[in-house]
From Swiss-Prot:
Pfam families in the cross-refs: EF_TS (PF00889)
GO cellular component terms listed in the entry, alphabetical order: cytoplasm
Species of provenance: Bacillus cereus (strain ATCC 14579 / DSM 31 / CCUG 7414 / JCM 2152 / NBRC 15305 / NCIMB 9373 / NCTC 2599 / NRRL B-3711)
GO BP annotations listed: translational elongation
Location, primary (coarse class): cytoplasm
Protein name (Swiss-Prot/TrEMBL): Elongation factor Ts
One Gene Ontology MF term: translation elongation factor activity
Highest taxon, organism lineage: Bacteria
Cytoplasm as UniProt keyword: yes
Subcellular location(s) of the protein: Cytoplasm
Coiled-coil segments: none
């Protein structure tokens, strides 16, 4: 297939590799982005591609707690300016309070529910859209529960650009739970621990690291040992409890949590707009199309 400049640009953004290396990788893999990433890694040209999707949408995350229940949600807007609007701030708090009280299973169910003011959630949002003048979208939410013996950790970074909710089991130390939430906001781990990583993902990483070591000219008899060592670093990058704790790099997150007498039951991390890409119009092409259309 034809390799476009946009494909090369995307691969460069994901791997940090040079333009010609990216073009060659895409050519060798017939335009398959994931295989091209593996190709570059096997050649030692690129590190593992970060899974953080491009963030393009605006809005805020918000966390509401009430006793043993907590909620994290994301409300999107078209511009950052509107996300700072008082009407937007009021809306996100109203939605959070309603969702935590009524506990809908998903966004679709939530939109059909009736709020305290007698209006459907969808209608309430539409009224805010009319006042604010921008499209607003309740994108996602998650409700988490705990017992009296546990603690929630709630952290909003940059006023809500990133929101993290943790549950510390067996400890009521909210400050510790929040410290872990701050770490998650900063480092963005993919899993709690190694047990959560699928066998397929581990095997895929092992194959890439093996090929990488062989391409470096390492003797086959020591490759297996090298790969296991590098797999350890791989787990440290993606597994929360294996990571060096941001507030005290001399200890792992696991050690910090255990020092507080608890275990980490789970976490939810939302970054505004992750996975959403705004349409990027090419202004020059747009002008040319208009000119052609007028002929």
């Amino acid at each position: 297939m034809a390799i476009t400049a946009q494909m090369v640009k995307e691969l460069r953004e994901k791997t940090g590799a040079g333009m010609m290396d990216c073009k060659k990788a895409l050519t060798e893999t017939n335009g398959d982005m994931e295989k091209a990433i593996d190709f570059l890694r096997e050649k030692g040209i690129a590190k593992a591609a970060k899974k953080a999707d491009r963030i393009a949408a605006e809005g805020l995350t918000f966390i509401e707690t009430n006793g043993n229940d907590a909620l994290i949600l994301e409300l999107n807007s078209e511009t950052d300016f509107v996300a700072k609007n008082e009407g937007f701030q009021t809306l996100i708090k109203e939605l959070a309070a309603h969702l935590l009280t009524n506990k809908p299973a998903n966004v679709e169910e939530a939109m059909a529910q009736t709020m305290e003011n007698g209006k459907k959630v969808e209608e309430h949002i539409n009224e805010a859209i009319a006042k604010i003048g921008e499209k607003l979208t309740l994108r996602r939410f998650e409700i988490v529960s705990k017992t009296d013996a546990d603690a929630f950790g709630a952290y909003l970074h940059m006023g809500g650009r990133i929101g993290v909710l943790t549950v510390l089991e067996g400890s009521t130390d909210e400050a510790a739970a929040k410290d872990v939430a701050m770490h998650i906001a900063a480092v963005n781990p993919k899993y709690i621990d190694r047990d959560a990583v699928t066998a397929e993902e581990v095997e895929h990483e092992r194959q890439v690291l093996t090929q990488q070591a062989l391409n470096e000219g390492k003797p086959e008899k020591i490759v297996a040992k090298m790969v296991e060592g590098r797999l350890g670093k791989f787990f440290e990058e993606i597994c929360l409890l294996d990571q060096a704790f941001v507030k005290n790099p001399d200890m792992k997150v696991r050690q910090f949590v255990e020092s507080k007498g608890g275990t980490l039951k789970g976490f939810v991390r939302y970054a505004v707009g992750e996975g959403i890409e705004k349409r990027e119009d090419n202004f020059a092409e747009e002008v040319m199309n208009q000119v052609k259309g007028s002929n």
